[in-house]
């Protein structure tokens, strides 16, 4: 073999051996040590709720079967939504994969009594307030105010779509109905149901005396008035076509149970409001009396007055006024002074027995009147004993207008008897009048929601609920008097109220809750309480760590950073590179285990003030997660032992024990605490578990056993079903201490992750620092992937990577029957494909669209080049775009290219040799000259074939004009031919051989030619240096007529000597080799 050729073949073999050795080292990973009993990995997805105002994720306090719910391919999470204006959206994500689902109305309000088409009414409640609990027969009207609690008062778009409310009043077997429609800014309406007077009749004989109550005037009415009870219920129904609610119904009807059955199937059942009492007050005049002195008295209406109203006050002579001890009343002067706001219009006599003269004087601040009263008869005034009051005169006063809601007006009275001294000023009488703008019979405070969850204890942010106070007039008019009321909280340790009385709130300084936290509102002489339910978090908080004992991990070295948190959260590439250089200077240390943390609590309250009975929101079986609420107030007692990576992750720093606590945002008091231990013991990674996740599916359903909570279940699909579909790996680490942790718990800067495909015809891998993606190429299944976890590049001590763990990954790629993407039939990673090792790709495209081998559309037709990589045609007919290559792939492809180039050079040399062999022939017999002929020289001691005379040319021959081949003109043959001659002679007889130049130095007649006889023959040349050993003579040895000619072809025409047998055998061997 030629030296040049042997060197190139050796380089090619060296490249091939390197590739095979590298592939062998990558196909046999070290088996991890058999793990012990490890906790099962759980799909590490993250849930997030949006478009909500108040919602919590939950956890069962005593889970029954957690293993059946959560696993490596499934995870369930319960949650509850308290306040929202629109349908919430639940998002679940895993790395770059995410999916969302809108929470359906049926899950949010499974049993809502207030159903509005195409409107969300979560936490909406219809509240009812009885205006008057005791209804007199003089005003036989039952009044109930309805309003919608839990609705945002700024939501005006729904006020025109609210339903009607029907009030049902039952008295024994009789029923009265009346309806109103909810509306207005507060979504309120007042139902007034007129009750039959027969319902105020005598009571049943069985009425107990204990049922009697005292009337407001202090009198005790008969038991008959107190025993009449009327039960009140309500239902909701849609308005009619005109938007009305129908007319009221009065008369006999079925009882409550029968009435519920009488409603249409779409109506809600009867909901109880309460009961009212009916009574008949004793007949009495609604007047009040005031004694001016022992002789005179006045009477005026017993009711509030209205602006502009004329008030008539009558002056009477009281009974028993003409006694001996009393001064004479036959003639007296009455002086009246009305304060500002009251005008005295005039006076007139009510009886002809009295003569009345008056003088009126109106001033800027008050008006006065002097009235002279005298007995008009000639007879003296008889004693007035045992008789009723005697009317004397009438005084008319007018109430002036004012801006406030109510005012107090005063009228002063002074009497001067003729002939007697006046009464002292202390005995002067004063009458006080109440003048109001409206005749309000009741006030009702309304809160936007009836419950308040005190999260301010955890966050320090105030939670407030707006409040409105409305007044109800006797006529049924509803007014907003929120700006005119006063308020006070009964216990600020539970709930507080603003100074302007427009909202109630909790600030975080409260210590307990209550089912009936009370705030009292006052309007003029009226007052009414507002009762709220206040929920407070149960303390101490429950802090849950996935691992309370953290250890160092053997072999896992990470860079030493000044602030691990800032390094993890940094996203700037320049900052990341700078930190990497700094960490290289600081060195590396062993990685500590990480632990996830969650904070839970229960919101509870007391059943009523003064009792210790505890009521838990959602029941005692649920814990509410408040990790996000307290994330800003988490503290590690000793920052040298551990630190917070983020709001959900703890990491160890050095051995020790430290408390982890949640502090109050207002008082720095500890709300919850747990101990964290960082041990000196080291643990090792026993197993790297990997699961392919091709897609995520999210499903929502009601939580079993609770109508308020919703269970979200996320399932991971491990099978890739589409061409070019991407999947990621869910990776978990198992430690020797029996704990497991997701790899995503650690920063991607602290490790290296290499995912490789063992058969790239089935799947390829797109390397990513945190989430390598698997791309489906063709159908297949098995352990087709391998995941390798290494330490950070900056902590590698040698060029050989430190592998922490490696694991095979099972992958299944199966395209559905309806899938039109091409599939790939392959015999396996270690077997050649059909057709002499070339793989076969079958496309699913239409006939005539397949791309033949060696042809690429738009690039012309190439020759039959052996394939180096198989590409699957895309169903759209477009060319597949190349993916980015990693450093490992670039190196492997470079070695493969060198190997292929060496093979190509070898093939070219072979082709050139064959072509030249087939086209070269010896010259025909008698040819005088041959261009490009090779001269074979045989040097030996055998006898010459011819005598000296025969070898010498005759005189005058053409030797002088025709170049003699014996001289071997090297100028005509070329250097390459000379080189071939030298190599062939060296191999033919073992001698060093001679060149043509050496032969010309010794003429044919030289005496030295007798010592060594030279034999010449001529063959067809092969002008290839490297393949000289494959030379084949142009002549056929078997042909007797074309034997080898020795000497020059121009002089050998006369004699055809027979070649020696050894040369004949040698040339046959050369031909056989070719």
Swiss-Prot record:
Single biological process term from Gene Ontology: posterior lateral line neuromast hair cell development
Pfam family, one: Ig_TMEM132_6th
Cytoplasmic side: 916-1074
InterPro entries: Ig_TMEM132_2nd, Ig_TMEM132_5th, Ig_TMEM132_6th, TMEM132, TMEM132_3rd, TMEM132_C, TMEM132_M, TMEM132_N
Tissue expression profile of the protein: Widely expressed, with highest levels in the cochlea. In the cochlea, detected in spiral ganglion, the organ of Corti and stria vascularis. In the organ of Corti, prominently expressed in the outer and inner hair cells, especially at the apical and basal region of the outer hair cell body (at protein level).
Entry's family note: Belongs to the TMEM132 family.
Name this protein carries in UniProt: Transmembrane protein 132E
């Amino acid at each position: 073999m030629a030296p040049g050729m042997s060197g190139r073949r050796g380089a090619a073999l060296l490249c091939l051996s390197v590739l095979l050795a590298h592939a062998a080292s990558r196909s046999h990973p070290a088996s991890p040590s058999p793990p012990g009993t490890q906790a099962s990995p759980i799909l590490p997805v993250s849930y997030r709720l949006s478009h909500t105002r108040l919602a919590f994720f939950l956890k069962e306090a005593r889970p029954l079967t957690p293993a059946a719910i959560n696993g490596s391919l499934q995870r369930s999470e319960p949650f509850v939504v308290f306040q929202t204006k629109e349908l919430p959206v639940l998002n679940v994500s895993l790395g770059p994969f995410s999916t969302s689902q809108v929470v359906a109305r049926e899950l949010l309000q499974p049993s809502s009594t207030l159903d509005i088409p195409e409107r969300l009414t979560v936490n909406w409640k219809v509240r009812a307030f009885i205006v008057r609990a005791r209804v007199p027969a003089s005003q036989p009207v039952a009044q109930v105010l309805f309003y919608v609690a839990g609705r945002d008062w700024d939501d005006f778009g729904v006020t025109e779509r609210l339903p009607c409310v029907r009030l049902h009043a039952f008295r024994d077997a009789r029923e009265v109905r009346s309806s109103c429609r909810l509306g207005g800014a507060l979504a309120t309406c007042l139902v007034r149901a007129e009750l039959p007077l027969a319902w105020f009749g005598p009571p049943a004989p069985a009425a107990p005396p204990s049922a009697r109550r005292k009337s407001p005037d202090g009198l005790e009415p008969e038991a008959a008035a107190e025993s009449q009870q009327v039960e009140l219920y309500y239902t909701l129904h849609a308005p009619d076509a005109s938007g009305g609610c129908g007319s009221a119904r009065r008369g006999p009807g079925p009882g409550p149970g029968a009435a519920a059955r009488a409603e249409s199937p779409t109506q809600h059942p009867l909901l109880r409001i309460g009961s009212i009492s009916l009574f008949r007050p004793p007949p009495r005049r609604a007047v009040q009396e005031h004694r001016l002195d022992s002789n005179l008295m006045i009477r005026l209406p017993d009711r509030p007055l209205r602006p502009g109203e004329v008030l008539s006050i009558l002056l009477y002579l009281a009974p028993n006024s003409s006694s001996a001890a009393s001064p004479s009343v036959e003639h007296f002067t009455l002086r009246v002074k009305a304060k500002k706001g009251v005008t005295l219009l005039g006076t007139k006599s009510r009886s002809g027995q009295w003569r009345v003269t008056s003088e009126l004087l109106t001033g800027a601040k008050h008006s006065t009147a002097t009235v002279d009263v005298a007995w008009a008869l000639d007879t003296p005034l008889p004693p007035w004993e045992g008789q009723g009051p005697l009317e004397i005169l009438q005084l008319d006063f007018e109430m002036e207008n004012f801006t406030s809601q109510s005012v107090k007006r005063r009228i002063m009275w002074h009497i001067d008897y003729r002939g007697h001294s006046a009464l002292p000023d202390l005995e002067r009488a004063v009458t006080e009048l109440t003048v109001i703008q409206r005749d309000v019979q009741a006030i009702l405070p309304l809160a936007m929601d009836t419950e308040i969850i005190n999260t301010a204890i955890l966050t320090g942010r105030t939670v407030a609920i707006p409040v409105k106070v409305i007044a109800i007039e006797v006529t049924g008019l509803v007014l907003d008097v929120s700006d005119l009321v006063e308020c006070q909280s009964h216990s600020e340790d539970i709930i507080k109220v603003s100074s302007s009385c427009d909202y109630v709130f909790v600030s975080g300084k409260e210590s307990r809750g209550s089912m009936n936290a009370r705030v009292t509102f006052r309007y003029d002489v009226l007052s009414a309480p507002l009762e709220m339910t206040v929920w407070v978090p149960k303390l101490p908080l429950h802090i849950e760590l996935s691992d309370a004992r953290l250890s160092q991990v053997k072999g896992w070295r990470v860079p030493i950073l000044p602030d691990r948190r800032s390094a993890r959260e940094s996203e700037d590439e320049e900052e990341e590179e700078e930190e990497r250089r700094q960490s290289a200077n600081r060195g590396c240390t062993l990685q500590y285990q990480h632990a996830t943390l969650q904070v839970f609590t229960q919101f509870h309250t007391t059943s009523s003030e003064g009792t210790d009975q505890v009521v838990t929101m959602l029941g005692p079986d649920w814990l509410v997660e408040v990790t996000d609420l307290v994330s800003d107030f988490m503290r590690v007692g000793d920052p040298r032992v551990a630190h917070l990576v983020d709001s959900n992750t703890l990491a160890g720093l050095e051995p020790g024990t430290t408390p982890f606590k949640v502090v109050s945002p207002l008082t720095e008091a500890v709300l919850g605490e747990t101990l964290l231990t960082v041990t000196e013991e080291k643990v090792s990674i026993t197993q790297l578990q990997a699961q392919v996740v091709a897609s995520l599916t999210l499903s929502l359903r009601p939580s079993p056993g609770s109508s308020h909570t919703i269970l979200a279940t996320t399932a991971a699909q491990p099978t890739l079903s589409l061409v070019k579909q991407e999947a990621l790996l869910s990776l978990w680490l198992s430690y020797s201490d029996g704990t497991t942790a997701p790899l995503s718990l650690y920063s991607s800067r602290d490790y290296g992750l290499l995912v490789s495909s063992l058969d790239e015809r089935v799947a390829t891998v797109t390397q990513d620092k945190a989430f390598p993606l698997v791309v489906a190429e063709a159908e297949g299944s098995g352990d087709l992937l391998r995941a390798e976890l290494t330490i950070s590049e900056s902590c590698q001590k040698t060029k050989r990577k430190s592998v922490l763990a490696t694991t095979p990954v099972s992958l299944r790629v199966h395209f559905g029957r309806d899938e039109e993407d091409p599939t790939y039939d392959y015999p396996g990673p270690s077997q050649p494909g059909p057709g002499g090792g070339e793989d076969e790709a079958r496309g699913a495209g239409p006939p005539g669209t397949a791309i033949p081998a060696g042809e690429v559309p738009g690039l012309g037709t190439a020759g039959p080049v052996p394939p180096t990589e198989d590409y699957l045609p895309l169903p759209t007919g477009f060319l597949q775009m190349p993916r980015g290559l990693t450093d490992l792939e670039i190196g492997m492809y470079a070695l493969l290219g060198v190997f292929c180039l060496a093979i190509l050079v070898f093939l070219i040399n072979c082709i050139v040799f064959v072509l030249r062999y087939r086209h070269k022939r010896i010259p025909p017999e008698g040819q005088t000259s041959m261009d490009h002929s090779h001269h074979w020289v045989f040097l030996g001691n055998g006898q010459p074939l011819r005598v000296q005379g025969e070898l010498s040319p005759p005189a005058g021959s053409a030797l002088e004009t025709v170049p003699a081949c014996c001289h071997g003109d090297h100028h005509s043959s070329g250097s390459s031919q000379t080189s071939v001659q030298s190599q062939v002679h060296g191999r033919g007889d073992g001698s060093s051989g001679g060149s043509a130049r050496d032969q010309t130095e010794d003429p044919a007649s030289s005496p030295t030619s007798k010592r060594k006889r030279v034999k010449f023959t001529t063959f067809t040349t092969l002008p290839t240096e490297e393949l000289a050993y494959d030379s084949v003579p142009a002549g056929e040895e078997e042909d007797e007529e074309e034997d080898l000619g020795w000497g020059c072809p121009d002089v050998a025409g006369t004699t055809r000597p027979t070649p020696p047998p050894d040369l004949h055998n040698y040339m046959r061997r050369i031909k056989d080799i070719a």
